[in-house]
Protein backbone atom coordinates (compact mmCIF):
# COMPACT_ATOMS: atom_id res chain seq x y z
CA UNK A 1 0.00 0.00 0.00
CA UNK A 2 2.82 2.41 0.85
CA UNK A 3 4.32 2.24 -2.65
CA UNK A 4 0.89 3.29 -4.01
CA UNK A 5 0.99 6.52 -1.98
CA UNK A 6 4.69 7.49 -2.01
CA UNK A 7 7.05 7.06 -4.97
CA UNK A 8 10.68 7.12 -3.84
CA UNK A 9 12.30 8.17 -7.16
CA UNK A 10 9.86 11.08 -7.56
CA UNK A 11 10.80 12.32 -4.08
CA UNK A 12 14.55 12.26 -4.74
CA UNK A 13 14.24 13.80 -8.21
CA UNK A 14 12.23 16.77 -6.95
CA UNK A 15 14.41 17.05 -3.84
CA UNK A 16 17.55 17.32 -5.95
CA UNK A 17 16.13 19.77 -8.50
CA UNK A 18 14.51 21.92 -5.80
CA UNK A 19 17.81 21.97 -3.92
CA UNK A 20 19.59 23.24 -7.03
CA UNK A 21 16.96 25.92 -7.62
CA UNK A 22 17.19 26.98 -3.95
CA UNK A 23 20.97 27.19 -4.24
CA UNK A 24 20.65 29.52 -7.24
CA UNK A 25 18.39 31.81 -5.21
CA UNK A 26 20.65 31.69 -2.14
CA UNK A 27 23.80 32.46 -4.17
CA UNK A 28 22.15 35.51 -5.77
CA UNK A 29 20.82 36.77 -2.44
CA UNK A 30 24.23 36.33 -0.81
CA UNK A 31 25.83 38.23 -3.70
CA UNK A 32 23.40 41.13 -3.24
CA UNK A 33 24.18 41.26 0.49
CA UNK A 34 27.86 41.65 -0.38
CA UNK A 35 27.20 44.36 -2.96
CA UNK A 36 24.68 46.62 -1.20
CA UNK A 37 23.57 47.79 2.19
CA UNK A 38 20.67 45.57 3.24
CA UNK A 39 18.66 48.66 4.25
CA UNK A 40 19.08 50.42 0.90
CA UNK A 41 16.16 50.64 -1.58
CA UNK A 42 18.39 49.15 -4.32
CA UNK A 43 19.01 45.99 -2.29
CA UNK A 44 15.32 45.55 -1.50
CA UNK A 45 14.33 46.07 -5.15
CA UNK A 46 16.87 43.55 -6.43
CA UNK A 47 16.01 41.07 -3.68
CA UNK A 48 12.37 41.21 -4.77
CA UNK A 49 13.44 40.65 -8.38
CA UNK A 50 15.32 37.50 -7.37
CA UNK A 51 12.36 36.06 -5.45
CA UNK A 52 9.82 36.95 -8.13
CA UNK A 53 12.02 35.56 -10.92
CA UNK A 54 12.60 32.29 -9.09
CA UNK A 55 8.92 31.94 -8.16
CA UNK A 56 7.81 32.64 -11.74
CA UNK A 57 10.16 30.00 -13.14
CA UNK A 58 9.01 27.46 -10.55
CA UNK A 59 5.33 28.21 -11.21
CA UNK A 60 5.69 27.63 -14.96
CA UNK A 61 7.49 24.34 -14.35
CA UNK A 62 4.80 23.15 -11.94
CA UNK A 63 2.11 23.99 -14.51
CA UNK A 64 3.93 22.10 -17.26
CA UNK A 65 4.53 19.10 -14.99
CA UNK A 66 0.91 19.02 -13.79
CA UNK A 67 -0.35 19.27 -17.38
CA UNK A 68 1.88 16.38 -18.47
CA UNK A 69 0.73 14.13 -15.63
CA UNK A 70 -2.93 15.06 -16.14
CA UNK A 71 -2.79 14.32 -19.88
CA UNK A 72 -1.02 11.02 -19.33
CA UNK A 73 -3.38 9.68 -16.66
CA UNK A 74 -6.58 10.92 -18.32
CA UNK A 75 -5.87 10.28 -22.02
CA UNK A 76 -2.92 7.95 -22.52
CA UNK A 77 -3.18 5.57 -19.58
CA UNK A 78 -5.39 2.97 -21.34
CA UNK A 79 -3.73 2.94 -24.74
CA UNK A 80 -1.74 -0.27 -24.29
CA UNK A 81 -4.74 -2.58 -23.72
CA UNK A 82 -3.68 -6.21 -24.03
CA UNK A 83 0.03 -5.28 -24.33
CA UNK A 84 0.25 -4.06 -20.74
CA UNK A 85 3.26 -6.24 -19.84
CA UNK A 86 5.24 -4.88 -22.80
CA UNK A 87 4.49 -1.28 -21.84
CA UNK A 88 5.23 -1.93 -18.17
CA UNK A 89 8.59 -3.41 -19.17
CA UNK A 90 9.46 -0.53 -21.49
CA UNK A 91 8.41 2.10 -18.94
CA UNK A 92 10.48 0.38 -16.26
CA UNK A 93 13.58 0.41 -18.47
CA UNK A 94 13.03 4.09 -19.34
CA UNK A 95 12.73 4.85 -15.62
CA UNK A 96 16.03 3.00 -15.03
CA UNK A 97 17.80 5.38 -17.42
CA UNK A 98 16.24 8.47 -15.81
CA UNK A 99 16.95 7.38 -12.23
CA UNK A 100 20.54 6.41 -13.06
CA UNK A 101 21.19 9.85 -14.56
CA UNK A 102 19.61 11.51 -11.52
CA UNK A 103 21.80 9.42 -9.19
CA UNK A 104 24.92 10.64 -10.96
CA UNK A 105 23.69 14.23 -10.57
CA UNK A 106 22.95 13.61 -6.88
CA UNK A 107 26.57 12.60 -6.27
CA UNK A 108 27.69 16.00 -7.60
CA UNK A 109 25.27 17.97 -5.43
CA UNK A 110 27.87 18.82 -2.79
CA UNK A 111 29.77 20.83 -5.43
CA UNK A 112 26.61 22.50 -6.69
CA UNK A 113 27.05 25.65 -4.61
CA UNK A 114 30.50 26.41 -6.03
CA UNK A 115 29.33 25.48 -9.54
CA UNK A 116 26.49 28.01 -9.50
CA UNK A 117 28.66 30.77 -8.05
CA UNK A 118 31.02 30.36 -11.00
CA UNK A 119 28.15 30.02 -13.50
CA UNK A 120 26.42 33.19 -12.30
CA UNK A 121 29.70 35.11 -12.29
CA UNK A 122 30.30 34.05 -15.90
CA UNK A 123 26.75 35.08 -16.81
CA UNK A 124 27.37 38.56 -15.38
CA UNK A 125 30.65 38.83 -17.27
CA UNK A 126 28.93 37.78 -20.52
CA UNK A 127 26.17 40.37 -20.05
CA UNK A 128 28.88 42.96 -19.53
CA UNK A 129 30.67 42.13 -22.79
CA UNK A 130 27.59 41.84 -25.04
CA UNK A 131 25.63 44.94 -25.98
CA UNK A 132 22.26 45.03 -27.73
CA UNK A 133 19.09 47.07 -27.45
CA UNK A 134 17.26 44.08 -25.99
CA UNK A 135 19.93 43.51 -23.36
CA UNK A 136 19.92 47.19 -22.46
CA UNK A 137 16.18 47.00 -21.79
CA UNK A 138 16.70 43.98 -19.56
CA UNK A 139 19.45 45.59 -17.48
CA UNK A 140 16.98 46.91 -14.92
CA UNK A 141 15.54 43.40 -14.50
CA UNK A 142 18.73 41.36 -14.74
CA UNK A 143 18.27 39.89 -11.26
CA UNK A 144 14.79 38.78 -12.28
CA UNK A 145 15.94 37.20 -15.54
CA UNK A 146 18.87 35.23 -14.06
CA UNK A 147 16.86 33.23 -11.47
CA UNK A 148 13.87 32.95 -13.81
CA UNK A 149 15.87 31.35 -16.63
CA UNK A 150 17.98 29.10 -14.40
CA UNK A 151 15.07 27.89 -12.25
CA UNK A 152 12.95 27.35 -15.37
CA UNK A 153 15.70 25.26 -16.94
CA UNK A 154 16.22 23.14 -13.82
CA UNK A 155 12.47 22.74 -13.43
CA UNK A 156 12.00 21.57 -17.01
CA UNK A 157 14.81 19.08 -16.43
CA UNK A 158 12.86 17.77 -13.43
CA UNK A 159 9.71 17.48 -15.57
CA UNK A 160 11.63 15.36 -18.10
CA UNK A 161 12.97 13.07 -15.37
CA UNK A 162 9.59 12.75 -13.68
CA UNK A 163 7.98 12.07 -17.04
CA UNK A 164 10.30 9.13 -17.56
CA UNK A 165 9.90 7.76 -14.05
CA UNK A 166 6.13 8.27 -13.70
CA UNK A 167 5.24 6.16 -16.74
CA UNK A 168 3.68 2.97 -15.47
CA UNK A 169 3.15 4.02 -11.84
CA UNK A 170 -0.08 4.96 -10.11
CA UNK A 171 -0.93 8.66 -10.17
CA UNK A 172 -1.78 8.76 -6.46
CA UNK A 173 1.84 7.92 -5.58
CA UNK A 174 3.10 11.23 -7.05
CA UNK A 175 1.56 14.13 -5.00
CA UNK A 176 2.91 13.28 -1.52
CA UNK A 177 6.37 12.41 -2.85
CA UNK A 178 6.47 15.59 -4.96
CA UNK A 179 5.38 17.87 -2.10
CA UNK A 180 7.85 16.31 0.36
CA UNK A 181 10.68 16.56 -2.18
CA UNK A 182 10.00 20.26 -2.79
CA UNK A 183 9.73 21.01 0.95
CA UNK A 184 12.98 19.18 1.79
CA UNK A 185 14.81 20.88 -1.10
CA UNK A 186 13.64 24.33 0.06
CA UNK A 187 14.75 23.51 3.61
CA UNK A 188 18.25 22.59 2.41
CA UNK A 189 18.42 25.81 0.37
CA UNK A 190 17.38 27.87 3.42
CA UNK A 191 20.04 26.23 5.60
CA UNK A 192 22.69 26.96 2.96
CA UNK A 193 21.59 30.60 2.76
CA UNK A 194 21.87 30.89 6.53
CA UNK A 195 25.52 29.90 6.33
CA UNK A 196 25.54 26.16 5.87
CA UNK A 197 27.42 24.12 3.32
CA UNK A 198 26.50 21.24 1.06
CA UNK A 199 29.72 19.48 2.05
CA UNK A 200 28.15 18.88 5.47
CA UNK A 201 25.38 16.97 3.68
CA UNK A 202 27.78 14.82 1.64
CA UNK A 203 26.84 11.52 3.25
CA UNK A 204 23.15 12.30 2.95
CA UNK A 205 23.53 12.73 -0.81
CA UNK A 206 25.61 9.54 -1.01
CA UNK A 207 22.87 7.69 0.86
CA UNK A 208 20.23 9.18 -1.46
CA UNK A 209 22.20 8.01 -4.49
CA UNK A 210 22.47 4.49 -3.10
CA UNK A 211 18.70 4.39 -2.56
CA UNK A 212 18.10 5.63 -6.11
CA UNK A 213 20.38 2.97 -7.54
CA UNK A 214 18.69 0.27 -5.49
CA UNK A 215 15.38 1.41 -6.94
CA UNK A 216 16.83 1.51 -10.47
CA UNK A 217 18.35 -1.96 -10.15
CA UNK A 218 15.01 -3.30 -8.95
CA UNK A 219 13.24 -1.62 -11.86
CA UNK A 220 15.74 -3.17 -14.26
CA UNK A 221 14.89 -6.63 -12.94
CA UNK A 222 11.15 -5.89 -12.99
CA UNK A 223 11.33 -4.50 -16.53
CA UNK A 224 13.00 -7.66 -17.81
CA UNK A 225 10.49 -9.70 -15.80
CA UNK A 226 7.55 -7.92 -17.47
CA UNK A 227 8.97 -8.61 -20.94
CA UNK A 228 9.54 -12.27 -20.07
CA UNK A 229 6.01 -12.49 -18.68
CA UNK A 230 4.61 -11.12 -21.93
CA UNK A 231 6.58 -13.73 -23.90
CA UNK A 232 5.18 -16.47 -21.62
CA UNK A 233 1.63 -15.18 -22.12
CA UNK A 234 2.13 -15.46 -25.87
CA UNK A 235 3.24 -19.09 -25.47
CA UNK A 236 0.22 -20.17 -23.42
CA UNK A 237 -2.16 -18.04 -25.47
CA UNK A 238 -3.72 -16.06 -22.64
CA UNK A 239 -3.24 -14.66 -19.14
CA UNK A 240 -0.69 -16.55 -17.05
CA UNK A 241 -3.11 -16.74 -14.12
CA UNK A 242 -5.41 -18.96 -16.18
CA UNK A 243 -2.75 -21.71 -16.57
CA UNK A 244 0.51 -21.23 -14.66
CA UNK A 245 1.92 -17.89 -13.57
CA UNK A 246 5.55 -18.39 -14.68
CA UNK A 247 7.82 -20.31 -17.05
CA UNK A 248 9.31 -23.12 -14.99
CA UNK A 249 12.32 -23.64 -17.27
CA UNK A 250 13.65 -20.10 -16.70
CA UNK A 251 12.63 -19.64 -13.05
CA UNK A 252 15.32 -19.45 -10.38
CA UNK A 253 12.80 -19.38 -7.55
CA UNK A 254 9.07 -19.12 -7.04
CA UNK A 255 7.71 -18.99 -3.50
CA UNK A 256 4.15 -18.80 -2.27
CA UNK A 257 4.97 -16.11 0.31
CA UNK A 258 6.28 -12.57 -0.20
CA UNK A 259 4.03 -11.68 -3.13
CA UNK A 260 4.04 -7.83 -3.35
CA UNK A 261 0.90 -7.85 -5.53
CA UNK A 262 -1.21 -9.80 -3.04
CA UNK A 263 -3.92 -7.71 -1.41
CA UNK A 264 -3.72 -8.90 2.19
CA UNK A 265 -2.53 -7.69 5.58
CA UNK A 266 0.93 -9.28 5.25
CA UNK A 267 1.89 -7.78 1.88
CA UNK A 268 2.75 -4.26 3.12
CA UNK A 269 6.41 -5.00 3.91
CA UNK A 270 6.88 -6.92 0.66
CA UNK A 271 5.45 -3.97 -1.26
CA UNK A 272 8.10 -1.72 0.28
CA UNK A 273 10.81 -4.23 -0.65
CA UNK A 274 9.37 -4.36 -4.16
CA UNK A 275 9.37 -0.56 -4.52
CA UNK A 276 12.91 0.00 -3.16
CA UNK A 277 14.75 -3.28 -3.81
CA UNK A 278 12.76 -4.75 -6.68
CA UNK A 279 11.82 -7.86 -4.69
CA UNK A 280 9.46 -10.36 -6.31
CA UNK A 281 8.39 -13.81 -5.19
CA UNK A 282 9.24 -15.06 -8.70
CA UNK A 283 12.75 -14.62 -10.12
CA UNK A 284 14.11 -15.65 -13.50
CA UNK A 285 17.56 -15.95 -15.02
CA UNK A 286 16.88 -12.80 -17.03
CA UNK A 287 15.80 -10.68 -14.04
CA UNK A 288 18.74 -11.76 -11.86
CA UNK A 289 21.35 -11.37 -14.62
CA UNK A 290 20.01 -7.92 -15.56
CA UNK A 291 20.09 -6.89 -11.87
CA UNK A 292 23.76 -7.89 -11.56
CA UNK A 293 24.73 -6.34 -14.91
CA UNK A 294 23.15 -3.05 -13.85
CA UNK A 295 25.31 -2.86 -10.72
CA UNK A 296 28.39 -3.81 -12.74
CA UNK A 297 27.67 -0.99 -15.19
CA UNK A 298 27.12 1.57 -12.41
CA UNK A 299 30.35 0.64 -10.61
CA UNK A 300 32.42 0.78 -13.80
CA UNK A 301 30.91 4.11 -14.83
CA UNK A 302 31.52 5.69 -11.41
CA UNK A 303 35.18 4.66 -11.50
CA UNK A 304 35.48 6.06 -15.04
CA UNK A 305 33.79 9.34 -13.99
CA UNK A 306 36.14 9.71 -11.03
CA UNK A 307 39.27 9.62 -13.18
CA UNK A 308 37.63 11.77 -15.86
CA UNK A 309 36.80 14.54 -13.37
CA UNK A 310 40.26 14.30 -11.88
CA UNK A 311 41.84 14.93 -15.29
CA UNK A 312 39.38 17.78 -15.95
CA UNK A 313 40.32 19.43 -12.64
CA UNK A 314 44.00 19.27 -13.57
CA UNK A 315 43.31 20.91 -16.95
CA UNK A 316 41.30 23.70 -15.28
CA UNK A 317 44.11 24.35 -12.81
CA UNK A 318 46.66 24.54 -15.63
CA UNK A 319 44.40 26.91 -17.60
CA UNK A 320 43.92 29.16 -14.57
CA UNK A 321 40.13 28.98 -14.68
CA UNK A 322 37.99 29.92 -11.70
CA UNK A 323 37.74 27.14 -9.19
CA UNK A 324 36.61 29.01 -6.09
CA UNK A 325 33.03 30.30 -6.27
CA UNK A 326 33.56 33.16 -3.79
CA UNK A 327 36.52 34.41 -5.83
CA UNK A 328 34.40 34.30 -8.99
CA UNK A 329 31.59 36.34 -7.41
CA UNK A 330 34.09 38.83 -6.00
CA UNK A 331 35.42 39.35 -9.51
CA UNK A 332 31.85 39.76 -10.83
CA UNK A 333 31.22 42.81 -8.60
CA UNK A 334 32.88 45.05 -11.17
CA UNK A 335 30.07 44.30 -13.63
CA UNK A 336 27.30 45.62 -11.35
CA UNK A 337 26.63 49.35 -11.02
CA UNK A 338 25.60 51.20 -7.87
CA UNK A 339 21.97 51.12 -9.01
CA UNK A 340 22.05 47.32 -9.39
CA UNK A 341 22.08 47.33 -13.20
CA UNK A 342 24.63 45.42 -15.27
CA UNK A 343 27.39 47.60 -16.67
CA UNK A 344 27.64 47.12 -20.43
CA UNK A 345 30.94 47.98 -22.05
CA UNK A 346 30.71 50.39 -24.97
CA UNK A 347 32.81 48.65 -27.60
CA UNK A 348 32.52 51.60 -30.02
CA UNK A 349 34.02 53.94 -27.44
CA UNK A 350 36.83 51.48 -26.78
CA UNK A 351 37.61 51.21 -30.51
CA UNK A 352 37.57 55.00 -30.89
CA UNK A 353 39.88 55.34 -27.91
CA UNK A 354 42.26 52.83 -29.41
CA UNK A 355 42.28 54.75 -32.70
CA UNK A 356 43.01 58.06 -30.90
CA UNK A 357 45.16 57.13 -27.90
CA UNK A 358 46.59 60.64 -27.50
CA UNK A 359 43.16 62.23 -27.18
CA UNK A 360 42.16 59.55 -24.64
CA UNK A 361 45.22 60.29 -22.48
CA UNK A 362 44.51 64.03 -22.55
CA UNK A 363 40.85 63.40 -21.68
CA UNK A 364 41.81 61.19 -18.75
CA UNK A 365 44.25 63.83 -17.52
CA UNK A 366 41.55 66.53 -17.59
CA UNK A 367 39.14 64.26 -15.65
CA UNK A 368 41.84 63.63 -13.05
From Swiss-Prot:
Membrane topology, from the record: Multi-pass membrane protein
Applied relevance: Passive immunization with anti-ftr1 immune sera protects DKA mice from infection. Thus, ftr1 is a virulence factor and anti-ftr1 passive immunotherapy deserves further evaluation as a strategy to improve outcomes of deadly mucormycosis.
Location(s), subcellular: Cell membrane
Region described as Disordered: 346-368
Gene Ontology cellular component annotations, sorted alphabetically: high-affinity iron permease complex
Primary localisation category: membrane
Listed GO MF terms: high-affinity ferrous iron transmembrane transporter activity
Source organism, top-level taxon: Eukaryota
InterPro entries assigned: FTR1/Fip1/EfeU (IPR004923)
Alphabetized UniProt keyword annotations: Cell membrane, Ion transport, Iron, Iron transport, Membrane, Transmembrane, Transmembrane helix, Transport, Virulence
Composition bias, Basic and acidic residues: 353-368
Membrane-traversing stretches: 8-28, 50-70, 86-106, 142-162, 173-193, 204-224, 287-307
Gene inactivation effect: Compromises the ability to acquire iron in vitro and reduced virulence in diabetic ketoacidosis (DKA) mice. RNAi-mediated knockdown decreases virulence in a mouse model of 3-hydroxybutyric acid (BHB)-induced acidosis.
Swiss-Prot/TrEMBL induction comment: Expressed in iron-depleted conditions and repressed in iron-replete media. Induced during infection in diabetic ketoacidosis (DKA) mice.
Record GO biological process: reductive iron assimilation
UniProt record similarity statement: Belongs to the oxidase-dependent Fe transporter (OFeT) (TC 9.A.10.1) family.
Function, as annotated: High affinity iron permease required for iron uptake in iron-depleted environments. Required for full virulence in mice.
Protein name in UniProt: High affinity iron permease 1
Gene: ftr1
